[in-house]
Amino acid sequence: MAVAAAVLVASVSEPSGGPPAPPVLGVSADKLLHGAAYATLAAAVALGLATPRGDGTPAGPVPPSGPTRRRVVGLAIGVAAVYGVVMEGLQGPLPYRTFDLLDAVANAVGAAIGAGAWTVGATLRDRVS
């Protein structure tokens, strides 16, 4: 929830108005920031889905492969990507923000990267324990 709240605040707040940051490896810093935010969101969603107990302790490792882990990854990507589209939609009517389809794409790509990173981390954790 905290990550989603931070993304919401960042999405609807008025930008600082400073000059845009220079591109990194040909990718605009804005798109990289979108990707990083939604990678974090998707990883948090995946972790939340794989940790069903209310006290935050895992109920048990999610199988390293199979439908359960794929379902967690798919849901994490879907939830984060849809949240990104909703955030872009909220920006449309704001006078200091705009709806940008490429931002939504960057959000979805970041979500896939974040869910993938969670998968790698969960797999490594399962192998170590």
Name each region found by the language model:
Residues 104:
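Conserved post-beta-strand hinge residue in the HATPase_c
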Residues 1-101, 112-129:
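Bulky hydrophobic segments
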